């Protein structure tokens, strides 16, 4: 930014010269608003696109850390080395250079016996690197969660941590507010309740449940969003494969009928917002087809084969309904339709 166009042009020229001296081969500054938005969309898509490139069946892990900006270059090198050292070779690093802030994403399959132990060792090494060697921040931009809570004291020191705990206890003596998320005495909390993303459907297996799709969904906040439909589908498949809790699986299957299947518009607007184009609506249509019985399939086949006759009958039926409304009082019509809905279990 600059106070005027002339100053901005001068600053851009200086930046181009500086970048050129350091080996940059493609430098493109633009003041075109549409182009700027397009470039920002690419940047915003790093998170989901990186997650979609992970091996199927693995969970995506992401954190954001920071170091003094004057040490950013060596910090990037050390972060890359740390990720590689612990076997996270597919990890990507991006962030906000002006703040010395790095985001990194990696993946692991926590159904494997050694995955949690490897993540434990990595997390301790990450804490030592960031808060020890670089005197930086383990949570540079986003909030502390259980993956970092075990290392808050190492970053801030025992005295500051004690003050935090005392303030927390003063305002929340029963530990009801966000329990164990910011402050947690369990040194292994970061490797407990690790999330898995089991294979459920090829249409959704690359979803990282980022939620970018949710604002576009007509049923969001009414029943379930696309992200929630995917999460429930994964949990149902996990329970089905493991045989862990048949009663819970039965309840999920039953409840999903309305919340997941019946209220999905199957419009696939979610895929427009999704950085990798996941079509939750197509998945739902597939699940609907699986739940249809032989009778429903027979009716659907008949309608498809006799579309013209069915449309004629429907037009006739609507005509009869119009005539009936002129003869039968409105309260009686309402009573008839209510009775039909009750008898048909709300299918009519």
What are these language model-derived features?
Residues 18, 42, 236, 286, ...:
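Residues that form generic nucleotide/phosphate-binding pockets
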Residues 1-6, 14-17, 222-228, 237-250, ...:
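N-terminal leader/propeptide and maturation segments of large enzyme subunits in energy/redox metabolism
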Residues 179-181, 212-236, 263-290:
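Iron-sulfur cluster-binding cysteine motifs and their immediate structural context
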Residues 93-96, 140-143, 231, 285-286, ...:
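Beta-strand segments within the central parallel beta-sheet cores of soluble alpha/beta enzyme folds
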